[in-house]
Structures are given as C-alpha cells and as structure tokens.
Amino acid sequence: KQIFIALCCFILLFVISLAGCGKGNTKNLVIDYGTSSIYTKDDMDEAIDVIKKQFSSFEGCELHSLSYTSDDACNNEDNIAWMNELEEANDNKESFTQCISFDSSFRSPKNGGGAWNANEEYTWSWWMARSEGGTWKLMTWGY
C-alpha cells in the first residue's frame, strides 16, 4: 500500500511539473502601441491580454510582436459592422460599437505538428470588439 501511495505521489508531482510545458510563450513579446486618439494604453493592454490568453493555447509557439494597426483600420463603420456580423453568425446578441486590431508575428514549434509548419514565422491579425465600456471579445484571428 505504501508503494502505491508513493507511486501516486510521484505521478502527481510529475504531472504538475509538466502543467506549464508546451504552452504558447509570450515572455519576449514586443508591443508597438502605435498612435491612437481613440484607445488608451490601458484599453490596448486589455485587448492584448485577450490575445495572450488565446495564444497560450498555441502549444510550442512563441509570440514575438504585437502591433496596433491604426484608428482608421479599426474603428470604421465597415469593420464594426463586420464584428457585429460575426457576433450574429455565432448566435450571440451583443451589439458592438468599437473594434480593435493588432498584427502579430510568432514562430511555430521547431518540429511543427498539427496545423503548424516546422519552425516557421507566421504573421496573423487579431480582431476584437466591445460595446461602449465593455470588455474586449476576440472575434477572429489568422492570416
């Protein structure tokens, strides 16, 4: 019985030690906030946190940079309408009044796997939306 308990403890410690392995790495992230007359640094940081949370599921990838696109690219009627169309397509009811976009570069895992080519640099865009005073919701990301 003692051997069984010791073995269970060893397995538990091993699993706990691996819990952080393989997740998307954002430690060396460089952020370019650009210039905005619409969003504060805090607004952008809240959006960046949403991106980082999603990126953490990109096993073995390393996020290198995030760059705010621009006020013109983000907060225009066409893109806000697009965000609302995406929301409706997902059967959700929130009505967005603001959107924000960041371009990114990141490296895929050295050995590739899944949808990733091995050790390749990717450049993706990340689009989020919110209603006035609300929290950012990640709507779409990719090429």
Predicted regions, residues:
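Sec-dependent N-terminal signal peptides of Gram-positive bacterial secreted proteins and lipoproteins
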Residues: 2-23
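Generic hydrophobic secondary-structure signal
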Residues: 5, 18, 55, 100-102, ...
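Residue-level signal for the start and early helices of compact helical domains
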Residues: 7-12, 93, 97, 119, ...
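Short acidic, gly/pro-rich beta-turn/loop elements at beta-sheet edges
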Residues: 16, 112-114, 138
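Flexible low-complexity loop/turn motifs enriched in small/helix-breaking residues
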Residues: 20-120
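Short beta-strand edge/turn micro-motifs at domain boundaries
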Residues: 121-143
